[in-house]
Design a protein with these regions (language model features):
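Interaction-mediating elements
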Residues: 1-138
Length: 138
């Protein structure tokens, strides 16, 4: 179960573009990172420009006021190659939604399975599954 937070500046995107951004992120996770269909949990936050603080040229990128921060909490275990492909696919998909590649900042936060409760106040994975680190899956 990836949990995705997208943060962007107020007034820089339309509702249609935000939907396309969310769809592009989700599609990349399903196609590249082996996230199951219908395993979709996303939050889009629009914040005032005054509350979106970033270095516009850090590491040689040319970030604009339309920068998009993407933070994904997901089960641990994907390879560096899968992560690299995921980042590239997200940039491609978001590019189709009108977001410049230099304006995309992605952060993956890998979690152990025992750190998830999908509801009911219960550990969502059986103890045997929670104690092992997966190589694929959400």
């Amino acid at each position: 179960m990836p949990l995705v937070y997208v943060t962007l500046a107020e007034g820089t995107t339309s509702q249609d573009q935000r939907t396309r951004i969310a769809n592009g992120i989700y599609r990349a996770m399903v196609d590249v990172a082996d996230v199951p269909e219908d395993d979709r949990f996303q939050v889009i936050n629009e914040v005032s420009c005054a509350n979106l603080i970033y270095s516009p040229d850090y590491l040689g990128f040319d970030r604009s006021p339309s920068v998009v921060f993407i933070q994904i909490f997901l089960n641990a275990g994907r390879s560096v190659d899968v992560k690299r492909e995921l980042y590239a696919r997200m940039a491609e998909n978001l590019g189709a939604a009108g977001v410049r590649a230099d304006d995309i900042l992605i952060n993956l936060v890998e979690m152990a399975k025992e750190n998830w409760s999908f509801g009911g106040g219960e550990l969502s994975y059986p103890p045997a599954a929670a104690s092992s680190t997966p190589t694929t899956g959400s």
